[in-house]
Amino acid sequence: MAFPYVRDNRLEITCGEAPYIVSRYDTTTGAAIPIEQRIGILDRKLRIVSENTETSGEWLEWAQEAYKSTYAYEWQGDNLLIARETMLVTFIEYYQQKFGKRPLLKSINYIAYIISWNVWQMDGLKGVVPNSCGERRTLVYELFGTKEDVSQCEGCAKDDIRRHNGTYCLIKDWRAKDPKTGKMGKRIRFIDLIK
């Protein structure tokens, strides 16, 4: 199958419940949207996969490619959970529509694994896990006692995304080999993608 769009990397920033990735329901009314009328980024990719594959194995291979190239981040954990759940249910719905049955649990679990790497919680202005950076306190032991040394986050003070002392978010580049494991799916810091 030669459909480069399925493998094109796409990112939804501050994704909320990910309505631009998957459009399972109308966000204003809550009404379900039939699969044929869905217009999200991943919906379009899965529609292309469904229209151009015959076997379950071929469909799963290309659906995995579609998920591996679709990314999103969100600051709020509750929205992140809904976004991930919506993407997972979308996988099941498209598979059921194509083959008339649910996918195997191992297939569902693998898509969930991909989603867990590709849809993550992040403060988009800092590139770190929300609320993970700030002042750091360390005890300094001296000859006549101890004192507390307080240092501020340099990234916050200088508005420099590369100098935060918080936990930087990791994602996977599914097409690059991880030097530690030798397997495809290299772990990278999201901010390292920013030029």
Q: How should each PLM-predicted stretch be described?
A:
Residues 1-127:
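Conserved S-adenosyl-L-methionine
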Residues 30, 43-46, 134, 166, ...:
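Intrinsic-disorder/low-complexity loop/linker signature
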Residues 6-26, 70-82, 119-128, 132-174, ...:
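Conserved proline-anchored active-site loop of SAM-dependent methyltransferases
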Residues 1, 54, 173-195:
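A Trp-anchored, charged/polar loop motif used as the substrate-binding/catalytic surface
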